[in-house]
């Protein structure tokens, strides 16, 4: 039963492949995202840039606010729970969100355990900086993986690092013989069967999106050309000068990511991009990607 449920959840996440998922804080923003062609929206009270700026403890959003967004659009709605906060996840499942993001953008509730995602019918998405983190999340029941990037910075460098790291580690697995795969599984702290499956597939067995710092159509196309299955755009759209136009351009860039002429065309006159942050100016203890294990 558990296996078939997991397969169903992976299949639901698969339906988002090739698309853009946008952070929205109001029903109106959700409508703009839907009209621009987003495959799903992420309902939250504050985009990561504001969470980063405001500090304090970031928790699950008010169910009333999430409900308002669910009612405003026809596309799937995601919402974030804190790492390890399985009760927030239970609440999100109860109000009918389509996917739950167990997110390092919110303040972790448990420093040792992530949520056991097999206990839920709703599919989970989780962040990962490398193959080991991705495999541990999949083992816990994640139906979708995304790079952690460094959310709220408008700086794509960490998302690029995480994607390249993961793809390089997968390529390395493909060169190993069966005996060496046992050692690799031990080093990755992941089940041998899963490691073996990835070596055979040459990719993760679930969809793998890019997230964290994607602010322009070029950023989205870069991540797609690196080999991810789709992109999350958080602060990059509604912190920019012309959200509707930028949202549409990022969707087009994600679809036509190899067409440089089109990318040039849709990158024109988008208004001000969000103000970015250089990662090396962020104090170590404020880096969101380091949360989770």
From Swiss-Prot:
The keyword Lyase applies. It catalyses: aldehydo-D-ribose 5-phosphate + D-glyceraldehyde 3-phosphate + L-glutamine = pyridoxal 5'-phosphate + L-glutamate + phosphate + 3 H2O + H(+). It comes from the Bacteria. D-ribose 5-phosphate binds at residues 23, 152, 213, 234-235. Pfam families: SOR_SNZ. GO terms for molecular function: pyridoxal 5'-phosphate synthase (glutamine hydrolysing) activity. One of its GO terms (biological process) is amino acid metabolic process. Keywords: Lyase, Pyridoxal phosphate, Schiff base. D-glyceraldehyde 3-phosphate binds at residue 164. The keyword Lyase applies. Its EC number is 4.3.3.6. Signal peptide: none annotated. The active site is at 80 (schiff-base intermediate with d-ribose 5-phosphate). Pathway: Cofactor biosynthesis; pyridoxal 5'-phosphate biosynthesis. Belongs to the PdxS/SNZ family. HAMAP family: PdxS. Catalyzes the formation of pyridoxal 5'-phosphate from ribose 5-phosphate (RBP), glyceraldehyde 3-phosphate (G3P) and ammonia. The ammonia is provided by the PdxT subunit. Can also use ribulose 5-phosphate and dihydroxyacetone phosphate as substrates, resulting from enzyme-catalyzed isomerization of RBP and G3P, respectively. In the presence of PdxT, forms a dodecamer of heterodimers. This is Pyridoxal 5'-phosphate synthase subunit PdxS. It comes from Herpetosiphon aurantiacus (strain ATCC 23779 / DSM 785 / 114-95).
């Amino acid at each position: 039963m558990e296996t078939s449920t997991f397969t169903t959840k992976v299949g639901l996440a698969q339906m988002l492949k090739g698309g853009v998922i946008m952070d929205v804080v109001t029903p109106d923003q959700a409508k703009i995202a839907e009209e621009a062609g987003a495959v799903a929206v992420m309902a939250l009270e504050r985009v990561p840039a504001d969470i980063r700026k405001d500090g304090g403890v970031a928790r699950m959003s008010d169910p009333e606010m999430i409900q308002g967004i669910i009612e405003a659009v026809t596309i799937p709605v995601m919402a974030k729970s804190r790492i390890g906060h399985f009760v927030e996840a239970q609440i999100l499942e109860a109000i009918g969100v389509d996917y739950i993001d167990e997110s390092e953008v919110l303040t972790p509730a448990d420093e040792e355990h992530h949520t056991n995602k097999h206990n839920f019918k709703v599919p989970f998405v989780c962040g990962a900086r490398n193959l080991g983190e991705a495999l541990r999340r999949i083992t816990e029941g994640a139906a979708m993986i995304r790079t952690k990037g460094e959310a709220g910075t408008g700086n794509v460098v960490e998302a690029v690092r995480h994607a390249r790291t993961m793809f390089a580690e997968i390529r390395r697995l493909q060169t190993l013989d069966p005996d060496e795969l046992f050692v690799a599984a031990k080093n990755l702290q992941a089940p041998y069967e899963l490691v073996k499956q990835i070596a055979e597939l040459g990719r993760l067995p679930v969809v793998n999106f890019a997230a964290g710092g994607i602010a322009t159509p070029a950023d989205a196309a870069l991540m797609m050309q690196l080999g991810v299955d789709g992109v999350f755009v958080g602060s990059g759209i509604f912190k920019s000068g012309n959200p509707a136009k930028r949202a549409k351009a990022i969707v087009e860039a994600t679809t036509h990511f190899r067409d440089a002429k089109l990318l040039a065309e849709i990158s024109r006159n988008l208004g001000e991009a969000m103000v970015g942050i250089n990662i090396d100016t962020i104090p170590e203890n404020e880096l969101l990607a380091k949360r989770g294990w």
